[in-house]
Curated annotation (Swiss-Prot):
GO MF: nucleotide binding
Described function: Nucleotide-binding protein.
Lineage of the organism: Bacteria, Pseudomonadati, Pseudomonadota, Gammaproteobacteria, Enterobacterales
InterPro entries xref list: DUF520, UPF0234-like_C, UPF0234_N, YajQ-like_sf
GO annotations of cellular component type: cytosol
Species assigned in the record: Salmonella paratyphi A (strain ATCC 9150 / SARB42)
Record-given protein name: Nucleotide-binding protein YajQ
Entry similarity comment: Belongs to the YajQ family.
Organism domain of life: Bacteria
UniProt keyword terms in alphabetical order: Nucleotide-binding
PANTHER family: UPF0234 PROTEIN YAJQ
Length: 163
């Protein structure tokens, strides 16, 4: 029986490349000359720290970062940015987390979405991914379109497609 897995992963190498591109653009922009503005990726806990001298500049840096990550194939929804920025002495910063894996609440929504579609497929939650099996390839492709179309708050990838 054909099957595939629904996952939500961020390629850390592409994230590193996107951060490097954003840093290069910040260094060359006129409005950031002479200003303490940094963007740094922490591989260990999968966060990106954005630091600047004002909250407005932090927002500008986040916009630059999102644009560069999007060019590298990482959607903006996979970046979890808190609403509040942290202010310490003369700098503002925010630590944005890269979403890895699918949370259990979102997994349940996906399984419910698949079951409500009345397609002849089965969905099983396996750790941080969802295995979908069915008799026909067309049903599996319909499930892929359904999951992409459903507004669930994060991007999904499909892997391990087997016949």
């Amino acid at each position: 029986m054909p099957s595939f897995d629904i996952v939500s992963e961020v390629d850390l190498q592409e994230a590193r490349n996107g951060v490097d591109n954003a840093v290069r653009e910040v260094e060359s922009r006129f409005d950031f000359r002479g200003v303490e503005a940094t963007i740094a990726l922490n591989d260990a806990n999968k966060t990106i720290k954005v630091l600047s001298e004002s909250d407005f500049q932090v927002n500008q840096l986040l916009d630059i970062l999102r644009a560069k990550l999007l060019k590298r194939g990482i959607e903006g929804a996979s970046l979890d940015v808190p609403d509040e920025f942290v202010h310490s002495s003369k700098t503002w910063y925010v630590e944005a987390k890269l979403k890895q894996g699918i949370e259990s609440a979102v997994q349940k929504k996906i399984v419910k979405l698949i079951k409500d579609s009345k397609l002849k497929v089965q969905a099983q939650i396996q750790g941080e991914e969802i295995r979908v099996t069915g008799k026909s390839r067309d049903d599996l492709q319909s499930v892929m379109a359904l999951v992409r179309g459903g507004d669930l708050g994060q991007p999904f990838q499909f892997k391990n497609f087997r016949d």
